[in-house]
Design a protein with these regions (language model features):
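Flexible "arm" and connector segments at domain edges
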Residues: 1-128
Length: 128
């Protein structure tokens, strides 16, 4: 990928992460279904780092402080990278992921969010 600034497609993200894996495949866990859960757990760990920034620095700092914002965005990228590793473990393509994303978006655009919220109002806390 060149140094020029551009947006990446889901396929780009998957391709870049696969290239990074190929470079380090002798040091990293394999990209196979057996190891997919590990990559998912790593992404959760990175989510924890995002949460820590929010808790320690606050929402305003993420919006207004360039250094805090850069750190937060880097953690977001870490989450995405580990999710791309997980997805690669299952050989899910960018096209599959894009199609699923668009389909979910379209369902959510038609969804009655008020109805969804009210259906859980009578459920006691801590119950499924």
């Amino acid at each position: 990928m060149s140094d020029e600034k551009r947006s990446c497609t889901l396929s780009d993200l998957l391709d870049m992460q696969h290239a990074l894996f190929e470079k380090h495949k002798h040091e990293w866990a394999p990209h196979d279904p057996e190891h997919a859960r590990s990559y998912l757990l790593y992404s959760v760990e990175e989510l924890g780092e995002m949460i820590a920034i929010i808790k320690k620095k606050g929402d305003d700092a993420i919006v207004e402080n360039p250094a805090v914002r850069a750190h937060y965005v880097e953690e977001v990228a870490d989450v995405l990278m580990y999710l791309m590793d997980n997805i690669d473990c299952y050989d899910i393509t960018g096209e599959e992921l894009s199609a699923a994303y668009v389909a979910k978006f379209e369902r959510n655009m038609k969804r009655d969010w008020h109805e969804n919220k009210t259906m859980y109002e009578d459920v006691p806390a801590g119950k499924d």
